[in-house]
Each structure stands twice: as structure tokens, then as C-alpha cells.
Amino acid sequence: MAKSIQVKLVRSPIGRPEKHRKVLQALGLTRLNKTVNLHATPAVAGAVKKVIHMVEVKEL
């Protein structure tokens, strides 16, 4: 696994369960097309896995 990953929000959280919105907020994804660089830890990987249908992930 890469040391860091780039995550971009590409699908709107409107109409999604509250749990998914909280995960996105915890990852720092507050707006559409916002990109964040995160360390690739097991906790971050699990959070990204929960919202993988709403984000794009790139390994850095």
C-alpha cells in the first residue's frame, strides 16, 4: 500500500445516509470536487471503503 493517498469527492452526499456524510466530513471532504491527501493507514482505508462509491482514490 502507498504511504499516502489522494481522495476526491465526485458524488454528492445529498440523499445519502447520515453515516456516509459523517465519514466524508471526517475525511475532510466537505464540498464536491474537493481533494485531500491522507496517510494510508488502516483507519483511513476503512473509512474510504465505506464511501468508495462517492470518491476517486489515487495512490501517491
UniProtKB/Swiss-Prot annotation:
GO terms of molecular function: structural constituent of ribosome
Keyword set for this entry? Ribonucleoprotein, Ribosomal protein
Query: Which InterPro entries does the entry mention?
Result: Ribo_uL30_ferredoxin-like_sf (IPR036919), Ribosomal_uL30_bac-type (IPR005996), Ribosomal_uL30_ferredoxin-like (IPR016082)
Record SUPFAM superfamilies: Ribosomal protein L30p/L7e
A GO cellular-component term linked to this record:
cytosolic large ribosomal subunit
Q: Is Ribosomal protein among this UniProt entry's keywords?
A: yes
One record GO biological process? translation
Which superkingdom? Answer: Bacteria
Please indicate if the UniProt record lists Metal-binding as a keyword.
Answer: no
Q: Indicate the quaternary assembly.
A: Part of the 50S ribosomal subunit.
Which family does the UniProt entry place this protein in? Belongs to the universal ribosomal protein uL30 family.
Name-wise, this protein is: Large ribosomal subunit protein uL30
Which organism encodes this protein?
A: Syntrophobacter fumaroxidans (strain DSM 10017 / MPOB)
State the encoding gene: rpmD
